Amino acid sequence: MKNYSEDTSRQYHIQVARGEIGRYVIMPGDPGRCEKIAEYLDTPLLIASNREFTTYTGMLDGEKVSVTSTGIGGPSAAIAMEELSRCGADTFVRIGTCGGMQPEVKSGDIVIATGSIRMEGTSKEYAPIEYPAVASLEVTNALVQAAKEDGCTWHTGVVQSKDAFYGQHEPEAMPVGYELLNKWEAWKKMGCLASEMESAALFIVAGKLRARAGACFLVMANQEREKLGLENPVVHDTDMAVRTAVGAVRNLIRCDKERE
């Protein structure tokens, strides 16, 4: 593919060049979270900041590790993963926020996705809808181990990936509200844990790239608990999810070294 960057050594969107990032990348959505995550690394350095894509690189347990933000939704997340892969990355850990869908999934909990419902559009331009969006078992196990070690309350299971934030929160206002509501009820009955906006695209793109990808989320709130009259505070502190993601990368580094 032609590189449209003025500096052709750098990827067009993320403005990063080969050699500037590690094989392990932690991927928040919000560029503002990158510096906070990078503080967990040794000697973190700001590599680039362009559009929604901010990248830091530092060291963790002797390995180069990067943090790159993706913005909101599947399209920009897929762009980031594609361009990071071209720079040498092959292991991706998504960290973000989600809304709980089951009564037992409470605000402040951590959800670790084993797979995603493909209710978004990006993944459909990579693979037929019959192809499942599943996380890497290695990354998922590393996330579970990190969550256990940190002592947080965590859940593993399927999440829903959507394109429209307000389609979830105000379905009655949408011309296709009947479809959104019916599918929401179906996902709940199937045990879907939470709703977010990126993981299906990331898991499918990872499959195309033969890369490893996993995802963990802070549960900010749960509208289903609110409907049941249960406690439903809004939680904004993502530190626990960040620690889980960083801990997972540590676990992956250790396992990868043991295999060498």
Range-by-range predicted roles:
Residues 200-233:
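Zn-dependent metallopeptidase/amidohydrolase metal-coordination segment
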Residues 142-150, 205, 244-255:
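Generic non-transmembrane alpha-helical segments
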Residues 28-32, 72-79, 87, 105, ...:
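Conserved active-site and cofactor/substrate-binding residues in soluble primary-metabolism enzymes
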Residues 223-260:
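His/Asp/Glu-rich mid-to-C-terminal helical/loop segments that flank catalytic regions of hydrolases
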Residues 133-191:
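Active-site rim beta-loop-alpha module in soluble metabolic enzymes
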Residues 90-91, 193, 212:
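Short acidic/polar active-site loop segments enriched in Thr and Asp
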Residues 1-142:
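Metabolite-binding pocket within alpha/beta catalytic cores that recognizes anionic/polar moieties
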Residues 44-49, 151-158, 253-260:
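Flexible, glycine/charged-enriched surface loops at secondary-structure junctions
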